[in-house]
Amino acid sequence: MTNIRKSHPLIKILNHSFIDLPAPSNISAWWNFGSLLGACLGIQILTGLFLAMHYTADTATAFSSVTHICRDVNYGWLIRYMHANGASMFFICLFLHVGRGLYYGSYMYIETWNIGIILLFTIMATAFMGYVLPWGQMSFWGATVITNLLSAIPYIGTTLVEWIWGGFSVDKATLTRFFAFHFILPFIIAALVMVHLLFLHETGSSNPSGINSDADKIPFHPYYTIKDILGLLLLIFLLMSLVLFSPDLLGDPDNYTPANPLSTPPHIKPEWYFLFAYAILRSIPNKLGGVLALILSILILAIFPLLQLSKQRSMMFRPLSQCLFWILTADLLTLTWIGGQPVEHPFIIIGQLASILYFSIILIFLPMFSLLENKLLKW
């Protein structure tokens, strides 16, 4: 009798994806973040579901319903903070996952990479809409500022913004539709993840050396299942440490004040994981230019396969490109810091320089250094 995992139509798919999948024998812990992102998505969907059972998407009661969850619902505070900090863990894993892809040349699997970029945009949209739901000060003003950016689109901008708002300002209609979208998008993300995995399993995973690993594959289970479980335990440890010891560490105190359209907070800023893009947006004095730079700061990932001029796929044996990669990382951290600062000297100029450096490294220096390293190979 054939093993059920190899014959059953449904279990067979799972078997080929997670059990008998041939995996390179030398992939490091940087390859753990895919499974961690899957775990984060699962945590977010579950905690979100339980929050939705008690939340009301109405301007009059949204803020007090979140308060009610934290005070009156059994372990409501735990579910709420796991959901809020789970988003932070999600983005930490996302940034590390994308960084791994850039460092080891995973972007050469173009279909997988492009679906990944679509996933990134979808997750960012979901997180933004989720931040609006508690209806605190930063929720309201964040929603107002970010949706208002669409008014920079020539001719149709203002109409588009009012269409998204469902009125002439961010109000009840906006909150209700944001809740609807915030609920449905994670399931769309889950479907996109399936497509992401489908494309990945067409080629198999890359590996740190960047060379073909067909000659040396090992089964995913038990080798990488046990490795993923270790990663998952560390993720849960970090998440629960954050939730139980300092749940508001990454949040904004302004969001504990109910939304008031008549009082603007002194510094409107998004959650920490959007600050780098927010800093790039603010560094351009023109509204439309800023919006374009904001979108391009992430969309630029799509042109990495075109900028691959090196004869080696991975950066493992390319010290000059490695230096640039870590300068880019430092630059992104600088942008994240600047995004959280007020718009005044010297932060404005630092933000502008960091933004110029961000695009210069990707568009000019990385391809240039790749060609230089190709020359060095001939010596």
From Swiss-Prot:
Entries under CDD domains matching the protein: cytochrome_b_C, Cytochrome_b_N
Molecular function GO labels: metal ion binding; ubiquinol-cytochrome-c reductase activity
Source organism superkingdom: Eukaryota
Keywords for this protein: Electron transport, Heme, Iron, Membrane, Metal-binding, Mitochondrion, Mitochondrion inner membrane, Respiratory chain, Transmembrane, Transmembrane helix, Transport, Ubiquinone
Details of cofactor binding: Binds 2 heme b groups non-covalently.
Cofactor: heme b
Entry's transmembrane regions: 33-53, 77-98, 113-133, 178-198, 226-246, 288-308, 320-340, 347-367
Intracellular or extracellular location(s): Mitochondrion inner membrane
Residues where heme b b566 binds: H97, H196
GO cellular component: mitochondrial inner membrane; respiratory chain complex III
Gene Ontology biological process: mitochondrial electron transport, ubiquinol to cytochrome c
Record SUPFAM superfamilies: a domain/subunit of cytochrome bc1 complex (Ubiquinol-cytochrome c reductase), Transmembrane di-heme cytochromes
Positions bound to a ubiquinone: H201
Membrane topology: Multi-pass membrane protein
Binding residues for heme b b562: H83, H182
PANTHER family for this protein: CYTOCHROME B (PTHR19271:SF16)
Assembly mode: The cytochrome bc1 complex contains 11 subunits: 3 respiratory subunits (MT-CYB, CYC1 and UQCRFS1), 2 core proteins (UQCRC1 and UQCRC2) and 6 low-molecular weight proteins (UQCRH/QCR6, UQCRB/QCR7, UQCRQ/QCR8, UQCR10/QCR9, UQCR11/QCR10 and a cleavage product of UQCRFS1). This cytochrome bc1 complex then forms a dimer.
Other observations noted: Heme 1 (or BL or b562) is low-potential and absorbs at about 562 nm, and heme 2 (or BH or b566) is high-potential and absorbs at about 566 nm.
Function: Component of the ubiquinol-cytochrome c reductase complex (complex III or cytochrome b-c1 complex) that is part of the mitochondrial respiratory chain. The b-c1 complex mediates electron transfer from ubiquinol to cytochrome c. Contributes to the generation of a proton gradient across the mitochondrial membrane that is then used for ATP synthesis.
Family under the similarity heading: Belongs to the cytochrome b family.
Protein name: Cytochrome b
Gene: MT-CYB
